[in-house]
Amino acid sequence: WNAYKVHELAEKALLRAHELGSSNTWVLSNHDIIRHATRFGVDGTFDTGKWFKANRFNPKVNVKQGLERATAMTMLLLALPGSTYLYQGEELGLQENMEIPDELMQDPQFFRNPDLGLSRDGCRVPLPWTASAANAYGFSTRDVEPWLPQPDGWGSYAIGPEHDSDASMLTLYQRILRSRKSLDAEAPLE
């Protein structure tokens, strides 16, 4: 988390796209990496592989800091020219599920190299739609176990409660996206 480094990376990407006559594509999270709201909640430089191997508890994640930094980075990316991809659940402020036991892992990467303990399943957990844990937090129409377990408290990130709150991450994303839509995409960068 370094403002100079972020500026340097964005500037290089923008200049390179300009040289090539193309546009940029920005992304903070996807189905193969730790959710950015979790990554940004860890201070300092750390090895993601070692973090997974250590059951993802060392260093500890500062959830509040992660969400604040994720919000700042999202606002920055959505202000930049080009396309921005949003990964499912980031608009809710979802954290990485770091509590999936080995016996419930689904990721082929985990089974190919079990000694490494690496899995991408923590960012692939079904989204919470309702605050109630019933029916996999509303992800299903029946009371069934989802293919990956949802962590306790997942309902606090649910779409329903977030939709009803002016202070929620979902509402913030909606406001930012409306603002982005109103920007002049053809304006030169200064």
Task: Enumerate the language-model features and the residues they cover.
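Active-site and adjacent substrate-binding regions of carbohydrate-active enzymes
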Residues: 1-190
